[in-house]
């Protein structure tokens, strides 16, 4: 048999056989296949896929008319409203990069982001206009003579106080719908010439003190949009409830993915258990994503706000802080099917999933919940995932006990951090993306996070997983939410300090008795050195996606001062 020459690999790319990957094509296809199907619902507003496509083309055209295109960044400060959904397509259709800004950030942080990203335009929901206005004033003061005011567009919403919109318009901002009128609904948008072109910029300002700009590509967004939908088993025509903020990792890529599957997007400005249950009943919601704290809110909803049993199976994807098995069990008991995922802003959101195995079906529910609480295996678009010894970069044994760092590589990894070569060098060391999360690898190959490297508590030379302590505390009947951090300890160096939010029905008149009861509970369920030496009650500081801000709690624990010598 003759050998095939190199010419088998020398066939060139051309316009007929190669197109840069971009999720923008999903919208064009949805408008063609299901032009009259409802694409987006927000209050009384209903759009079809054809209308959404035309609106996005208008939006892109209007941006180009203001000389905003390739190389530009457009910041959007808004909750889950149609304009934010449209921006995910329209801004890159114009050739620009979309930067979805966390609405819970303060003005000084937003000023930093707008300056760091050189935002050419700022779109802001009317409710947050004063926040954007203050941020722009700070940016102008800091930039001085170099300041160039960005194009300012205000997004009106009938559910908000009309006075805030009136004020914004008086300052010279353009109303969003008026802005669209200046564009062409038949705008001939062009896909990127290179799929490595940037599509999105996000900032990792969640649980750390210093934000870093995460740059994502059209290629990565395309692959992760499909990968996220495939691993979750989303079917064509799914009805998706936006409980997860779209500004968090581009809504875990479901902003683009829902167009690929021609589904329906239900927008929620504010997330409450009542709102979630009502949407399930009213719209027939089939899927939603949420941080564990939202799941906790759902399972602890008052009976008058809940709908039990559910009218149909509802699929839920959760990520963020690892959910306690008790919460997963409670969600399952109420009729929700929870898929547990894990990821970071640097990996387009979730990039691993605890893929369900048929053999788990016959296990007791609590055992199922424990297995499902693991972070699992890689997404289809993530080619490399491992847990390694950071000193040697060798994989840890799959024994379920040896901890190492989670590392990743593949199409699900960001292009890099904007204007931060040092961070890029550190994050991409040895050809892997370093997550900073500590995990074990089980015999079945599934990984399970034990802690963030900075969240490990070192007490008397022994490592304590704050996550393990938290999971036990969630079993206490009075605990609604909990976060455990290190507190200085005169004898042990550090000891666990538990910050606890109590359930609404708990008598809070005697916190000392409650604290003693919680500590006693822990002593019966964990090694003595794991037991929290101090318990603090009150609401926990969180990001917009419900992640508990441990850096704030660590600072608070430090301010409390060192614990005096104890025998525990």
Curated annotation (Swiss-Prot):
Which tissues is this chain's protein expressed in? Mostly expressed in glandular trichomes (lupulin glands) after flowering and in old leaves, and, to a lower extent, in stems, young leaves, cones and flowers.
Q: Which UniProt keywords apply?
A: ATP-binding, Cytoplasm, Ligase, Nucleotide-binding
In Swiss-Prot or TrEMBL terms, this protein is called Acetate--CoA ligase CCL3
Please provide one cellular component term from the Gene Ontology annotations of this protein: cytosol
| Pathways involved | Secondary metabolite biosynthesis
Q: Which gene encodes it?
A: CCL3
Q: What is its EC number?
A: 6.2.1.1, 6.2.1.-, 6.2.1.17
Which family, according to UniProt?
Belongs to the ATP-dependent AMP-binding enzyme family.
Which InterPro entries does this UniProt record tie to the protein? Answer: AMP-bd_C (IPR025110), AMP-bd_C_sf (IPR045851), AMP-dep_synth/lig_dom (IPR000873), ANL_N_sf (IPR042099)
Q: What does the protein in this record do?
A: Involved in the biosynthesis of prenylated phenolics natural products which contribute to the bitter taste of beer and display broad biological activities. Catalyzes the ligation of CoA on propanoate to produce propanoyl-CoA. Can also use 2-methylpropanoate (isobutyric acid), acetate, butanoate, isovalerate, pentanoate, hexanoate, 2-methylbutanoate, 2-methylpentanoate, 3-methylpentanoate and 4-methylpentanoate as substrates with a lower efficiency.
GO molecular function terms noted in the UniProt entry = 2-methylbutanoate-CoA ligase activity; acetate-CoA ligase activity; ATP binding; CoA-ligase activity; medium-chain fatty acid-CoA ligase activity; propionate-CoA ligase activity
Please state what the annotation says regarding this protein's domains: Both substrate-binding domains (SBD1 and SBD2) are involved in the substrate recognition, and are sufficient to confer the substrate specificity.
Where are the residues of the annotated region SBD1?
272-340
Q: Where is this region: SBD2?
A: 341-417
Q: Which Pfam families does the protein's record reference? A: AMP-binding, AMP-binding_C
